[in-house]
């Protein structure tokens, strides 16, 4: 995972001052503080606070007499805004993680569980029946790292606390079996941080395994540390920052390639904010992302929200790349998760108000299906002009070219042409 965890390992506590150079002169130190403990209602999503946490009573209202989920879209919307009561997470999460289909009956789900439990045991048997040569290779590539990770994952959690805790061994088996089930992915450092909360809430080995499979295979929220996956996420995030926080993006541009790598947020994406917020807040963020309400990329709006709320010092003091990494690393466990969630929902709402979006962000709404712009004006796509392998925009984007940088267009323009439309409108 390169040095993604460097800030967390080296700087576990939040300092009151960050020094630009290791010198004794007090004037060489820059002062920092955590601000924005509240969010004005004018900056909130208009439907904020209209939804309560999904409790058992509300959940049962969404189930018909056969146990099928009715009004799935409304359910996901309620989860997006209100979250899920911890007492029913083990029942609801399998739906969000594509283990159960929403239209399955209670009887069908029980039969499915039995079928998948048999499949899981078959996967485990494949691992246990490896030849000595296969096992040696597996130990070197997978098991050695898994064994190191599981013993230090969430050990403060009562569910995993103590020596010889059987739940730690269950987590270990799930991770080893997943590496056999999906050898192309294998095991990546940090997966234990994702499995641990699933096992804590679901508390069944086979069900947890298949929910983890759904998490890894069916949600864009998860990004492996492999370069192509990570770079795609970072490209979208850079474009969102350019659109919504132009001053911060300009600062990144001034820092050059190092700044544009966005090293400070790699851990956010790889570990799904689990190292940045207490479990209570992090799991609420997971649920909001899993709800897939209006976008499959809500985690990127969470990233932008963190920068909006806690990144002002970066531009005010013109922090260098390493200082920026230190600044955001030291915010770990000191940020207001509920505030970040509310701001992210507001950012998504304002993104949907744009009549034109750059083609670089076209895929942010490509897979979400109904909901991103349901019953609303569908925005026109503006070509960024950055398609070296094509004379025309592959997304059919139009452009309002600047004299110095003409961009090709392949279809008539729709919607407003003003480039000012990309200035993020602030609510006040």
Predicted region positions:
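N-terminal transition regions in large eukaryotic proteins
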Residues: 1-182, 199-202, 313-314, 365-428
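Extended, Lys/Glu/Leu-rich amphipathic alpha-helical scaffolds
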Residues: 40-41, 45-53, 132, 207-265, ...
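Eukaryotic basic, amphipathic alpha-helical target segments in cytosolic regions
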Residues: 67, 83, 96, 100-104, ...
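Hydrophobic core segments within long, regular secondary-structure runs in both alpha-
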Residues: 76, 117, 147, 168-175, ...
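Secondary-structure capping and boundary motifs in well-ordered enzyme cores
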Residues: 84, 142, 163, 167, ...
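Short sequence/structural elements of tandem HEAT/ARM alpha-solenoid repeats
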Residues: 109, 166-169, 189-190, 210-211, ...
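Active-site-adjacent structural elements in folded domains
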Residues: 136, 157-164, 175-182, 195, ...
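Contiguous, well-ordered alpha-helical segments that form the cores/surfaces of helical PPI scaffolds
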Residues: 172-180, 192-200, 210-217, 239, ...
């Amino acid at each position: 995972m390169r040095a993604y965890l460097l800030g967390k390992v080296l700087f576990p506590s939040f300092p009151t001052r960050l020094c630009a150079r290791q010198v004794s002169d007090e004037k060489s130190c820059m002062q920092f503080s955590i601000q924005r403990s509240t969010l004005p209602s004018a900056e909130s999503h208009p439907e904020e606070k209209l939804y309560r946490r999904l409790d058992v009573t509300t959940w049962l209202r969404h189930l018909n007499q056969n146990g099928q989920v009715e009004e799935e879209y409304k359910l996901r919307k309620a989860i997006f805004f209100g979250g899920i009561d911890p007492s029913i997470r083990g029942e609801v999460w399998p739906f969000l993680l594509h283990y159960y289909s929403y239209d399955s009956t209670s009887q069908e789900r029980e039969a499915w569980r039995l079928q998948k439990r048999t499949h899981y045991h078959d996967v485990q048997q494949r691992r246990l029946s490896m030849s000595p040569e296969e096992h040696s290779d597996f130990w070197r590539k997978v098991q050695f790292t898994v064994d190191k990770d599981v013993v230090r994952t969430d050990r403060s959690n009562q569910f995993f606390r103590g020596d010889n805790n059987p739940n730690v061994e269950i987590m270990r088996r799930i991770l080893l079996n997943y590496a056999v089930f999906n050898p192309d992915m294998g095991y990546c450092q940090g997966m234990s941080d994702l499995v641990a909360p699933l096992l804590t809430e679901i508390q069944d080995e086979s069900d947890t395994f298949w929910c983890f499979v759904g998490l890894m295979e069916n949600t864009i929220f998860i990004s492996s540390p492999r370069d192509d996956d990570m770079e795609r996420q970072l490209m979208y995030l850079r474009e969102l920052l350019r659109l919504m926080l132009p001053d911060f993006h300009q600062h990144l541009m001034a820092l050059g390639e190092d700044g544009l790598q966005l090293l400070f947020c790699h851990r956010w994406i790889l570990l799904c904010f689990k190292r940045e917020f207490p479990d209570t807040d992090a799991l609420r963020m997971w649920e909001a992302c899993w709800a897939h309400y209006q976008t499959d990329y809500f985690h990127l709006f969470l990233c932008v929200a963190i920068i909006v709320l806690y990144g002002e010092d970066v531009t005010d003091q013109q922090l260098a790349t390493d200082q920026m990494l230190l600044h955001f690393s030291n915010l770990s466990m000191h940020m207001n998760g509920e505030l970040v969630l509310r701001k992210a929902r507001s950012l998504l709402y304002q993104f949907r108000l744009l009549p034109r979006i750059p083609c670089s962000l076209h895929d942010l709404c490509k897979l979400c299906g109904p909901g991103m712009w349901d019953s609303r004006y569908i925005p026109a796509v503006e070509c960024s002009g950055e398609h070296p392998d094509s004379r025309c925009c592959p997304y059919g984007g139009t452009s309002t070219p600047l004299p110095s940088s003409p961009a090709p267009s392949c279809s008539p323009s729709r919607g407003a042409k003003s480039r000012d439309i990309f200035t993020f409108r602030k609510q006040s």
